[in-house]
Amino acid sequence: MDNFTVGVVVFPGSNCDRDVSWALEGCLDIRTKYLWHESSDLSDVDAIVLPGGFSYGDYLRCGAIARFSPLINALDEFVKSGKRVLGICNGFQILTESGFLPGALVANKNLNFICDDVELDIVSTKGGWFNNGDEKQTIKLPIAHGEGRYHCDSDTLKKLVDNELIALRYKNNPNGSSFDIAGITNEKGNVLGLMPHPERACDETIGGTDGLFTLKSLILK
């Protein structure tokens, strides 16, 4: 995978792009390239990460303005080609606003910003996410969000369950998410959105390495 490159998207207001790049390059030796949101040329990257932060200041709704950027418009063909896309926190919000993933991320039930480490059950490894030859069924990752409560209607929830599209569930739901959902994939399995931050759990010196389960999955084909 010497030539494999992960594009890390940068929006006005992104603040986790460097964290993602550090985790991929420093912990996994995976090459990264920053992609400014106005770019529509994705030809030289093999996978894409939409990082956390506050794209466009989260005006209107989280991810509501970012969905109109040229890069997100170009993402449609990228996804259709089968290449992998990971949306973390604000990136997950952008993926739902853009229609790449169903449902929505809304204000936490307690209306407060939550910053904590949470335990998560790996519910599905659809598309190869979290499936790196390890039998671990529970991981611990940090969360940091004010609008991270996953919400969908009953028909969508049934579809998520029936098609094994729920990747992660909270053990102790911190934000009121429907069905304790912390992360989901698309039907093809090459797009994953999750509210927890795997890039903040890639080295023991910063609290753990469970985030590697997610980031390693980017290099699968």
From Swiss-Prot:
Compartments in which it is found: Cytoplasm
Any one GO molecular-function label of the UniProt entry: glutaminase activity
Pathway as given in its UniProt record: Purine metabolism; IMP biosynthesis via de novo pathway; 5-amino-1-(5-phospho-D-ribosyl)imidazole from N(2)-formyl-N(1)-(5-phospho-D-ribosyl)glycinamide: step 1/2
Enzyme nomenclature, EC number: 6.3.5.3, 3.5.1.2
Reactions catalysed according to its record: N(2)-formyl-N(1)-(5-phospho-beta-D-ribosyl)glycinamide + L-glutamine + ATP + H2O = 2-formamido-N(1)-(5-O-phospho-beta-D-ribosyl)acetamidine + L-glutamate + ADP + phosphate + H(+); L-glutamine + H2O = L-glutamate + NH4(+)
UniProt-listed PROSITE patterns: GATASE_TYPE_1 (PS51273)
GO cellular component, one term: cytoplasm
Keywords for the protein's UniProt record, in alphabetical order: ATP-binding, Cytoplasm, Glutamine amidotransferase, Hydrolase, Ligase, Nucleotide-binding, Purine biosynthesis
InterPro entries: Class_I_gatase-like, PRibForGlyAmidine_synth_PurQ
SMART domains the record matches: GATase_5
Residue ranges that the Swiss-Prot or TrEMBL entry lists as coiled coil: none
GO biological process, one term: 'de novo' IMP biosynthetic process
Active site annotation, chain numbering: C89, H197, E199
All residue ranges annotated as the Glutamine amidotransferase type-1 domain in the record: 6-221
Record-linked HAMAP family: PurQ
Function description: Part of the phosphoribosylformylglycinamidine synthase complex involved in the purines biosynthetic pathway. Catalyzes the ATP-dependent conversion of formylglycinamide ribonucleotide (FGAR) and glutamine to yield formylglycinamidine ribonucleotide (FGAM) and glutamate. The FGAM synthase complex is composed of three subunits. PurQ produces an ammonia molecule by converting glutamine to glutamate. PurL transfers the ammonia molecule to FGAR to form FGAM in an ATP-dependent manner.
Assembly description: Part of the FGAM synthase complex composed of 1 PurL, 1 PurQ and 2 PurS subunits.
The name this protein goes by in its record: Phosphoribosylformylglycinamidine synthase subunit PurQ
Lineage, highest ranks first: Bacteria, Bacillati, Cyanobacteriota, Cyanophyceae, Synechococcales
